[in-house]
Amino acid sequence: MFQHTTVLLKEAVDGLNVRPDGVYVDCTLGGGGHSEYLLSRLSKRGKLFAFDQDETAILHASERLARYREQVQFINRNFRFLQEELSALGIHAVDGILFDLGVSSPQLDEPERGFSYQHDAPLDMRMDRKQRLTAAEIVNRWPYEELVRIFFRYGEEKFSKQVARKIEEVRRKRPIETTGELVEVIKAAIPAPARRSGGHPAKRIFQALRIAVNDELEAFREALEQAIELLAPGGRVSVITFHSLEDRICKETFKKASESPPLPPGLPVLPDDYRPVLKIITKKPVVPSAEELERNNRARSAKLRIAEKQ
């Protein structure tokens, strides 16, 4: 069953200042929780475009949102194609855009998807199952230097070199084909004292592989730039991140867009080109309440940032 506990539901959607007849985009449909709440705030004239590159997510969410079928349109593509897809539909400005960058719990919990170090399954990790690159391809074919780079950059794993070296050693004898096999390789590479602290020893490596397989950070960077461009004046963007790499991209993009470029001296009036594009609404990120964390432990690392188009 495709069930997913939505994180920061009201905070993210209410933060968009929803207008009943507005046009909105949910860039990360997932289980459909944010979309459902947003649609409940729209009139019959309102419209929601919901993106997800996972066909299964769209299938299940379309059932959940069946009563809103006149107001919602599903788009089965990565959100990095936000502008391209909306432009093809004749949409060039919107009133609000939402990103929830967490991996859907069902994707984590379906063993055959290969996202989780808790289950033994084929090394896959593709959000879009039509794409060719898998985690197995990276683990078995990418050179040592590339493995070190992604483990360190995307997983912030301090034992990146040791893990990459151990992978190289093992794959010379036989391919590493399952998540269980990879977990054993990681455990063998990380010193025992480090394995006993800081959560599961495979957590950071699995995060790094998932990000690399799906090109998550670059896709998000591109999509967020497009989202800012698409917003109508007064429109807002809500972004929920789950780790420091995504949060840094969001924070830096918002900061850059909310600053005026350096002004030439002696200008009597501030030209439009020199006005900030965004106003940051959340000076500090919004985090889940104690009550929400009690209901959903997976929300513990969530941060919400909101900005408004000037």
Swiss-Prot record:
| Residues involved in S-adenosyl-L-methionine binding | G32, G33, H34, D52, F79, D100, Q107
Gene3D superfamilies assigned: Putative methyltransferase TM0872, insert domain (1.10.150.170), Vaccinia Virus protein VP39 (3.40.50.150)
Chief subcellular location:
cytoplasm
Give the GO biological process terms.
rRNA base methylation
User: What's the protein here called?
Assistant: Ribosomal RNA small subunit methyltransferase H
Per the record, GO CC terms?
A: cytoplasm
What is catalysed by this protein?
Answer: cytidine(1402) in 16S rRNA + S-adenosyl-L-methionine = N(4)-methylcytidine(1402) in 16S rRNA + S-adenosyl-L-homocysteine + H(+)
Name the protein family.
Belongs to the methyltransferase superfamily. RsmH family.
Per the UniProt record, the lineage of the source organism begins with: Bacteria, Bacillati, Bacillota, Bacilli, Bacillales
Intracellular or extracellular location(s):
Cytoplasm
* GO molecular function annotation: rRNA (cytosine-N4-)-methyltransferase activity
For this protein, the Enzyme Commission number is 2.1.1.199
Any Pfam family matching the protein: Methyltransf_5
**Species per Swiss-Prot/TrEMBL record:** Geobacillus thermodenitrificans (strain NG80-2)
Among HAMAP family, the record links this protein to: 16SrRNA_methyltr_H (MF_01007)
- The answer to whether the entry has keyword Methyltransferase is yes
